[in-house]
């Protein structure tokens, strides 16, 4: 069985084809970074228009990559939310239209469930139950996962997401959009301990996060110091260490609270090398395992949507005939699959 996956929730157009026996057959991705760089962030209208231009050509490219035709596709999965409403509507409309034209089922997929399941595209996959850290530009959440659709929110950011804090702090340091990955690269040249940032909300019980204060702390630190390359690198190092430590402390609490021995990291920030090294160390101390997707499958992509669509379709999920998207869609509202 083969599923075509369509991802258009924000500023990446991702198309992939997943086979339940052969695995990932095609993975096409177009990023709009250059389009939005001059604005310092994603412009929703521009994002939607670019998805319109790129989605169908990428579908054609994916079919060519997999050496398949439309007749070889058994279902079409598309991101139905959460995300930018205009961008979501592009992918959902094209996905639903293709499914109708090809006479195959259309499967609406939750974007964050796609991220959560992305590590299952790797050879080493997690068994249930596990704690999931979903960490990206729009979300920072800790989830208890006991099966597909069996998600319990343990904690989340009460303000900025971790990825958003990375990008905003990078902008304060004068780095180009999107600055998060550039900040992380700069942090590698920083001196540990020259600056010490707080670890927000780690001095109290609970599993919620807060990262907006780190951005303010960074702004004050930048203003009070010289603008040399080394100082900027030292500030980047201090900021990254604070975010990573905060995430690690909360993950450890979640694992101890649930008693689970497996941690799944997903979302764009999960590609961060410092975060991966920190979590690997913690899981070794706890006698557990950490799982994550390869870096290119941590950011938005069609492969995770194709896989999630495959799993949901096998569990009996099929979308309505109309086109429906949900810009806001709590993960906990997803139905559980009867067969895990």
Curated annotation (Swiss-Prot):
Subcellular location: Cytoplasm
Biological-process GO terms, alphabetical: tRNA threonylcarbamoyladenosine modification
Source species, domain of life: Bacteria
Classification via InterPro entries: ATPase_NBD (IPR043129), Gcp-like_dom (IPR000905), KAE1/TsaD (IPR017861), Peptidase_M22_CS (IPR017860), TsaD (IPR022450)
Cofactor notes: Binds 1 Fe(2+) ion per subunit.
Keywords: Acyltransferase, Cytoplasm, Iron, Metal-binding, Transferase, tRNA processing
Positions contributing to Fe cation binding: 111, 115, 300
Catalytic activity: L-threonylcarbamoyladenylate + adenosine(37) in tRNA = N(6)-L-threonylcarbamoyladenosine(37) in tRNA + AMP + H(+)
Example of a GO cellular component annotation carried by this entry: cytoplasm
Alphabetized GO MF terms: iron ion binding; N(6)-L-threonylcarbamoyladenine synthase activity
Predominant localisation class: cytoplasm
EC number annotated for this UniProt entry: 2.3.1.234
UniProt xrefs under PROSITE patterns: GLYCOPROTEASE
Pfam families: TsaD
Residues binding substrate: 134-138, 167, 180, 272
Stated role: Required for the formation of a threonylcarbamoyl group on adenosine at position 37 (t(6)A37) in tRNAs that read codons beginning with adenine. Is involved in the transfer of the threonylcarbamoyl moiety of threonylcarbamoyl-AMP (TC-AMP) to the N6 group of A37, together with TsaE and TsaB. TsaD likely plays a direct catalytic role in this reaction.
PANTHER family: TRNA N6-ADENOSINE THREONYLCARBAMOYLTRANSFERASE, TRNA N6-ADENOSINE THREONYLCARBAMOYLTRANSFERASE, MITOCHONDRIAL
Family stated for the protein in its record: Belongs to the KAE1 / TsaD family.
HAMAP family documented for this protein: TsaD
Name of the protein this chain belongs to: tRNA N6-adenosine threonylcarbamoyltransferase
UniProt organism field: Proteus mirabilis (strain HI4320)
């Amino acid at each position: 069985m083969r599923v075509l996956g369509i991802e258009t929730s924000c500023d990446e157009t991702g198309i992939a084809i997943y086979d339940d026996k052969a695995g990932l057959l095609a993975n096409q991705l177009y990023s709009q970074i250059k389009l939005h760089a001059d604005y310092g962030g994603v412009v929703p209208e521009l994002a939607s228009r670019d998805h319109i231009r790129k989605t169908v050509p990428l579908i054609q490219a994916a079919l060519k990559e997999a050496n398949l035709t439309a007749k070889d596709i058994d279902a079409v999965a598309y991101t139905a939310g959460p995300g930018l409403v205009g961008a979501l509507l592009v992918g959902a409309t094209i996905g639903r239209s293709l499914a109708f034209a090809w006479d195959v089922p259309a499967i609406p997929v939750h974007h964050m469930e796609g991220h959560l399941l992305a590590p299952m595209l790797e050879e080493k996959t997690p068994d249930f139950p596990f704690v999931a850290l979903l960490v990206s530009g729009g979300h920072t959440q800790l989830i208890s996962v006991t099966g597909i659709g069996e998600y319990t929110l343990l904690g989340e950011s009460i303000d900025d997401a971790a990825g958003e804090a990375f990008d905003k702090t990078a902008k304060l340091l004068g780095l180009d959009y999107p600055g998060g990955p550039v900040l992380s690269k700069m942090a590698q040249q920083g001196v540990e301990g020259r600056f010490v940032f707080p670890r927000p909300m780690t001095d109290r019980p609970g599993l919620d996060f807060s990262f907006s204060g780190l951005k303010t702390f960074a702004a004050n630190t930048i203003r009070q110091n010289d603008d040399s390359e080394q100082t900027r690198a030292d500030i980047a190092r201090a900021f990254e260490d604070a975010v990573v430590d905060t995430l690690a402390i909360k993950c450890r609490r979640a694992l101890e609270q649930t008693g689970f021995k497996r941690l799944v990291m997903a979302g764009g920030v999960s590609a961060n090398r410092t975060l991966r090294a920190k979590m690997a160390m913690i899981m070794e101390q706890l006698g557990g395992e950490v799982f994550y997707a390869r870096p290119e499958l941590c950011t938005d992509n069609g492969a995770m949507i194709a896989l999630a669509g495959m799993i949901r379709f096998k569990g009996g999920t099929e979308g309505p005939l109309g086109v429906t998207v949900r810009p806001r869609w709590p993960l906990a509202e997803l139905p559980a699959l009867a067969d895990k």
